Amino acid sequence: MADQSSHQKYEFKKKLESLRGKKGRGTELISLYIPPDKQISDVVSQLRNEHSQASNIKSKLTKTNVQGAIDSIMSRLRYGTVPENGIVYFTGAVDVGANKTNMETTIVEPPQPIITYRYHCDSSFFLTPLEDMLKEAKTYGLLVLDRREATVGLLTGKQIEAFRNLTSTVPGKQRKGGQSAHRFQQLRLIAIHDFYKRIGDAASEVFLAVEQKDFEGVLIGGPSPTKEEFEAGNFFHHEIEKKVLDLFDVAYTDESGLSELVNAASERLEDLDLMVEKKLMQQFFRELVSDSGKATYGEDNVRENLIIGAVDILLISEDLRAVRETVKCTSCDYEQKTSREFKPGDSSSPTGNCPKCGSYLEITEKVDVVDQLSEICDQMGTRVEFISTDFEEGSQLLKAFGGVVAILRFNTGI
């Protein structure tokens, strides 16, 4: 069955994308954020005040639209109660093209509590508080180093980002002519110490800039004994020093080394969504390259396997946006079902003429592909996982496999 939290997150993200694409002609789109502890009577009273103030708007059309939007919200609030996380109303005259507008209302129950009451009127909906809820809070500091190079980065949610790359002036182990071995070794140790200090300062600057309540700790990667020398030398800021979690052997110290470090730390990070999703994609690829026949991809193949109950795990890209349309002839029995990708605000695709009789074709049904596949999974007891595009395998799922793949219970030959 579909994991409720991941499916709800997918639907929440899709709803925000739709709202982001809506525009008004003037400042006539209202965003109303109501916290869970706010009294409905107080909200209605404040909206009445906003309605009265809107009478001062010079443009007659804008005034009518703003007051109409406020009336629409008040009619919905009158008998309502505020859900446990609060509620958000997005209402207004949305520009639909051809010099026309349409009064629309979207109601959102957020996944996290609304903190502050807010009434906002503009030419677009105010989405920042809801968009912030999509951001992953947990952040890990990443550092990979040897005596030649170091890279500092952050792992936030599922995204790895490099912030600093440093190179050293540490001389090689072979000394130049005329230098005593002792003197050369002293200079080399000084250069190593200075480089470690530069690394510690740069990494501390990056890590301290993170909201510390969301900062889980630091992972250090590199060859031995370099990473151990660095960690023992207390080169981090004292607040960061306390948050070093573990050291891992990695071969690369450039940006690719950050990904290698995250993979090496997979056991420590096993509860992180990124690692769960990586393991699922790796399982799919293992089945795909083996001769087990227990991997399939492409919407049609996946759907056929779902219907017969053969799918163990359905993997769907978080960024997949597709609809399945049923097209029928207005004169004969011709019918066709096709899927197509869409973006918020897209209109229906052209239908054309019937290939059998030449009559006009019309779209008789349109369903969201993800919703439809998830519904079949619920009926069949199939597990559904949504995969982000913030890592290589997740990006491959969308770009190379069309956003839908499945791990099968048995080989069906489909």
Swiss-Prot record:
The keyword Protein biosynthesis applies. Keywords: Cytoplasm, Protein biosynthesis. It is found in: Cytoplasm. It comes from the Archaea. It holds the Pfam family eRF1_3. The keyword Transmembrane helix does not apply. One of its GO terms (cellular component) is cytoplasm. GO terms for molecular function: translation release factor activity, codon specific. Directs the termination of nascent peptide synthesis (translation) in response to the termination codons UAA, UAG and UGA. Belongs to the eukaryotic release factor 1 family. NCBIfam families: aRF1_eRF1 (TIGR03676). Heterodimer of two subunits, one of which binds GTP. This is Peptide chain release factor subunit 1. It comes from Methanococcoides burtonii (strain DSM 6242 / NBRC 107633 / OCM 468 / ACE-M). The gene is prf1.
